[in-house]
């Protein structure tokens, strides 16, 4: 959530910044007008409370002197009623103010490319040239189906579209990838966490998914009343429980940065994705991902973003997967992010790069919503800065391995870094079908 004081005192700057993220200037004018009305009502209420205290002292003194205080008591009752009305007005205006604030995205960094969509993203660097095969590459969904290690048809019957079964070497490969990621992340100084996969509404609001993106997730309903949702949602990313672990806490600034990593399922409705990536592992309702989260101080967050991005790049390099790093434009960056680098891995059959990780600096945006603070060496409290990045999306990594390491005979070589995690397996060959 943005700081209303920053918006109030830098209105033109705020309008210019948020215009690059699709926010109309009238929205900020409305917000500032509500804030002005709220502060005026609050000031008047506080003045009346001070007056009430003074009159209360006068009444007490009059009673001690056995003097008539009936007029003062009547006046104080009128003041009390006015205070009650003003406090209700402040409460209503605060709700209106927060309604707008909770739906405003983060301010973009000055270094972000300015533009309304992904076509304005800018390549920052590239690692290795795209894989060139001397035969026509197959897409990963064909490879997985022909090797009988991925089964979308049965998953569609059991669950629906955008679900998959991993089998045999496919299941082993997915597990190998996730374990490899966790091992590498912990070597890089991250503490492994196994978080809850269901979180409450306060947690979803804390990291910015609620209230704006309720249609993108799966919420648990009450069996007794299906129209009444419970206060539990399946996590769309482990970022939610990892960041919210620190919600409401005051941290020791000397202990920062705090680095945590988690492997978890992720559940997404993919609202608005009809017709996009209907085949394969790129866009699923349920998938696995390893997440990295950093809680840092305000001075170091930009350096920590570079470290986070390099941590994610290191994983792709160890797997020998060509990729490039892209700085997202103001119109393509996520709601909570001030700056995002996307890592996009090369997919030979699609003849293009596809996103496999987003590394973001959310500055104090999530910390203000979640009240995550730290105390500096002088005892002063500050809002922390939060960063998050995929390290990496497991299913998309499996897809990239199948496409980049495929052989002409349909088999797939196992990247050297993963062979110890796959019981020494070097080549994935066709699996027998169950009961056939």
From Swiss-Prot:
Residues 43-68 are annotated as: Disordered. One of its GO terms (biological process) is seryl-tRNA aminoacylation. Keywords: Aminoacyl-tRNA synthetase, ATP-binding, Cytoplasm, Ligase, Nucleotide-binding, Protein biosynthesis. It catalyses: tRNA(Ser) + L-serine + ATP = L-seryl-tRNA(Ser) + AMP + diphosphate + H(+); tRNA(Sec) + L-serine + ATP = L-seryl-tRNA(Sec) + AMP + diphosphate + H(+). It is an enzyme of class 6 (ligase). Residues 43-55 have a biased composition (Basic and acidic residues). Its EC number is 6.1.1.11. It comes from Lactobacillus johnsonii (strain CNCM I-12250 / La1 / NCC 533). Catalyzes the attachment of serine to tRNA(Ser). Is also able to aminoacylate tRNA(Sec) with serine, to form the misacylated tRNA L-seryl-tRNA(Sec), which will be further converted into selenocysteinyl-tRNA(Sec). This is Serine--tRNA ligase. It is found in: Cytoplasm. NCBIfam families: serS. GO terms for cellular component: cytoplasm. ATP binds at residues 268-270, 355-358. Pathway: Aminoacyl-tRNA biosynthesis; selenocysteinyl-tRNA(Sec) biosynthesis; L-seryl-tRNA(Sec) from L-serine and tRNA(Sec): step 1/1. It comes from the Bacteria. Homodimer. The tRNA molecule binds across the dimer. Belongs to the class-II aminoacyl-tRNA synthetase family. Type-1 seryl-tRNA synthetase subfamily. GO terms for molecular function: ATP binding; catalytic activity, acting on a protein; serine-tRNA ligase activity; transferase activity. Consists of two distinct domains, a catalytic core and a N-terminal extension that is involved in tRNA binding.
């Amino acid at each position: 959530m943005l700081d209303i004081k920053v918006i109030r005192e830098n209105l033109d700057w705020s309008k210019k910044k948020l215009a690059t993220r699709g926010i109309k200037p009238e929205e900020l004018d409305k917000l500032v007008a509500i804030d002005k009305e709220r502060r005026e009502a609050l000031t008047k209420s506080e003045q009346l409370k001070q007056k009430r205290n003074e009159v209360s002292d006068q009444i007490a003194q009059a009673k001690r002197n056995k003097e008539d205080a009936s007029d003062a008591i009547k006046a104080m009752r009128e003041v009390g009623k006015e205070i009650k009305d003003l406090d209700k007005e402040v409460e209503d205006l605060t709700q209106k103010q927060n309604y707008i604030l909770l739906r405003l995205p983060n301010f973009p960094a000055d270094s972000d490319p300015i533009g309304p969509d992904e076509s304005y993203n800018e390549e920052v660097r590239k690692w290795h040239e795209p894989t060139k095969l001397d035969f026509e590459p197959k897409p990963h969904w064909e490879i997985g189906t022909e090797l009988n290690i991925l089964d979308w048809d049965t998953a569609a019957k059991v669950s629906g579209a955008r679900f998959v079964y991993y089998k045999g070497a496919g299941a082993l490969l997915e597990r190998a990838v996730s374990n490899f990621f966790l091992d590498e992340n912990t070597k890089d100084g991250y503490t492994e966490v196994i978080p809850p996969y269901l979180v409450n509404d306060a947690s979803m609001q804390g990291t910015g998914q609620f209230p704006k993106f309720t249609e993108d997730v799966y919420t648990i309903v009450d069996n007794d009343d299906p129209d009444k949702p419970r206060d539990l949602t399946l996590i769309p990313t482990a970022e939610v429980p990892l960041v919210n672990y620190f919600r409401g806490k005051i941290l020791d600034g000397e202990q920062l940065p705090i680095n945590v990593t988690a492997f978890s399922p992720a559940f997404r409705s993919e609202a608005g994705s009809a017709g996009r990536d209907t085949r394969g592992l790129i866009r699923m309702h349920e998938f696995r991902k390893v997440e990295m989260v950093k809680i840092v101080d305000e001075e170091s967050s930009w350096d920590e973003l570079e470290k986070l991005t390099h941590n994610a790049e290191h994983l792709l390099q160890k797997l020998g997967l060509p990729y490039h790093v892209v700085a997202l434009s103001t119109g393509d960056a996520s709601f909570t992010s001030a700056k995002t680098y996307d890592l996009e891995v090369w997919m030979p059959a699609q003849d293009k790069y596809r996103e496999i990780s987003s590394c973001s600096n959310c500055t104090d945006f999530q910390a203000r919503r979640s009240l995550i603070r730290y105390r500096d060496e002088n005892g002063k409290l500050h809002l922390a800065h939060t960063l998050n990045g995929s390290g990496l999306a497991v299913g998309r990594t499996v897809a990239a391995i199948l496409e980049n390491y495929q052989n002409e005979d349909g088999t797939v070589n196992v990247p050297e870094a993963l062979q110890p995690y796959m019981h020494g397996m070097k080549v994935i060959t066709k699996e027998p079908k169950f009961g056939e």
